[in-house]
Amino acid sequence: YFRFDVKDSPKGYLYRTNFSVAGVEDQGAGYIRYEAATKLFEEKGSEFTPGWILDNPARSFYHGLMKRDLKDLSDRQLGEGYVISQDYIPRYTTVSSIVFEGVNPGEDPANTVLWSAIGYAPCSYAIPVWVGAGDEIPACLSSKDKALAPANEFAMDLKGIVFPITRGNGNKYLDYLTLRRDILPAIVKAEDKEIAEGEKLNKSFITEGFNIEKVRKFNAKADKRFEAFREKMQKILEK
């Protein structure tokens, strides 16, 4: 294998999309997604916050080959609402979108945060968990008896709304209009709240030290927020 060190990158960051940059040319997958990622990261340039990564590359429907972003299409242009979901960064097979947020030199590694959106990224919002908390994570992110975690299960339910065709090549057809109109706004709103609350707690850890009791209280509130989100979104499933 070949190790790439981000310190050697003139841009100060690296991004990869499945295929081997150092391997045999034109083998592997993800070349078109790489072009999409290139556009997104170069336009942003710096200050890649967890929120930006989760809400931009992870949910982007910019096509690296066709140079077209679905968000720029009007409802009328979308017609019946369906698009062919091929070579976008979020794929039908996507199972999660996660961001590891480390600490600065001299800071406590226990404050390292995993922002975890489990399930199809456009239908799931991120909830933070802390390294220092060990196995203490929100119940909505936990699974029992090999069942799906509640957050994952609900993301799968929402995914079923935007990929409603189950026969033949149905999983290639995304109801983008429904996703954009009925689901993404609620996902982004829920995630913005979660990130704001998580960042506030993390800042207190930096100044006051890691506190497991604060994490437990945060987790309980995160579970309540998830339950409220799930209840609110039930009307989408009942249409």
Where are these regions (language model features)?
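C-terminus-biased signal that marks the final domain/tail of proteins
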Residues: 1-239
